[in-house]
Amino acid sequence: MCDIMEIKKFIETIKGTKLFTAYNTNVDAIKYLKDEDVQKLVDEFNHKDIIERMEEYPRIIEEPLDFVARLVHSIKTGKPAEVPIKDDKKLHEWFDRIKYDEERMGGQAGIVSNLMATLQIDKIIVYTPFLSKKQAEMFVDYDNLLYPLVENGNLVLKKVREAYRDDPIKINRIFEFKKGLKFKLNGEEITAKQSTRFIVASRPEALRIEIKDDVRKFLPKIGEAVDCAFLSGYQAIKEEYRDGKTAKYYFERAEEDIKLLKKNKNIKTHLEFASISNIEIRKMVVDYILSNVESVGMDETEIANVLHILGYDELSNNILKDSFIEDVIEGAKILLDKFKNLEVVQVHTIYYILFVCRADNPLSKEELEECLEFSTILASTKAKLGNIRAIDDLHEGLKIPHNKYGDLLKEIAEKFNDNNYKIALSPSRYVEKPKSTVGLGDTISSGAFVYYVSLLNKKRMS
């Protein structure tokens, strides 16, 4: 199939789909790190203090040393990470003195909404609790991208850019680095194993991951208006707030949100997992959200973290240590066995994207692979160009070949297909030095999920 026809087929498949996304959008301030940037950062501190703090592995950034220690750890291991920052004026001022290279849309709901609007699916309804003018302007200017408001007691869908309020702005600082970046720490030369990113995530006290009551009562109506929902941002929930509300309160509301969305129409829902440093919050995402959705997307570290919560410590540690595909597939099967609500577990890594389903899934293995192939093209396009601004950009992603391990990975995955499970794998189209890695996982997951729902709908209608 020629490139133009292949892209046309993919876009034609998804064009009738309607999507709801929530909850997290923010402004990403991005710094593309060079060798000298990191060297300058580590030289601000005693190198032995950095090493000691790395061993302590801080789960919240309370001072600049915590940040430098976790950044170095991320570079050294080649693993992406997201760590919340304490809401402290002096600490924010320290980060503000860094010269960032650009600002762009951040947050899974924001990134996915912009992508799907650009790909011209039929309708996207996005909800985020904060929508300042600056945030609203970071959404792409398309008529298919809408925000739910209540006016005179009625649900109204407005273009996102016209729906802004006088809300605070949530800013995440993103530190991107490329494979091969080098610096010295205490006499040791450290080299970045992979191109990835480290996120310093702000958690403003005023930000609550919830749908406000006025819109919330219309969730059954919103659910009726869409085919599927892509849900994310739960990592921003705090254990406790100054007004006495707790994580349990917000997770109970979030669980109810899913039920309300499905009240009038049995839509497909997807949880996009994330790097969650707080183990209690991670457990609540599993207990309240994972147990209520049909689809979940995660990377290998995230599936390992979920398996740890479920008590599979040895398998979890093996995945964290070696990332063998056999262990990842075994972990995905465990999730399907534990959570009967799940139809599909999707795992994305640098080298592949994987679907693990039960054998009775209505889509064939070839159709599942088609979903994954579409998502790899989206990912390679975004990695190469930094962003997807038009459908024609996908031709750039399609030019990038699958990585050299593709045949071996497909061969291994094929061995796990049996009477109980259906497994599909697509090797990634590997961009050696990506322009940007932020949002790659969200791009992969949303592409695969929306395509999956589109094929299910077509199958049902035929």
Swiss-Prot record:
Keywords for the protein's UniProt record, in alphabetical order: Cytoplasm, Glycolysis, Kinase, Magnesium, Metal-binding, Multifunctional enzyme, Transferase
All copies of domain ADPK, residue ranges: 1-458
EC number(s) given by UniProt: 2.7.1.146, 2.7.1.147
Pfam families registered for this protein in UniProt: ADP_PFK_GK
Cofactor: binding details: Binds 1 Mg(2+) ion per subunit.
GO cellular component, one term: cytoplasm
The keyword Metal-binding appears for this protein: yes
Cell compartment(s), UniProt: Cytoplasm
SUPFAM superfamilies in the cross-refs: Ribokinase-like
Obligatory cofactor(s): Mg(2+)
Residues annotated for Mg(2+) binding in this entry: 272, 302, 442
GO biological process, one term: fructose metabolic process
Listed InterPro entries: ADP_PFK/GK, ADP_PFK/GK_arc, ADP_PFK_arc, Ribokinase-like
Pathways involved: Carbohydrate degradation; glycolysis
UniProt function note: Catalyzes the phosphorylation of fructose 6-phosphate and D-glucose to fructose 1,6-bisphosphate and D-glucose 6-phosphate, respectively, using ADP as the phosphate donor.
Subunit structure and binding partners: Monomer.
HAMAP family linked: ADP_PFKinase
Protein's name according to its UniProt entry: Bifunctional ADP-specific glucokinase/phosphofructokinase
Organism: Methanocaldococcus jannaschii (strain ATCC 43067 / DSM 2661 / JAL-1 / JCM 10045 / NBRC 100440)
Gene that specifies this protein: pfkC
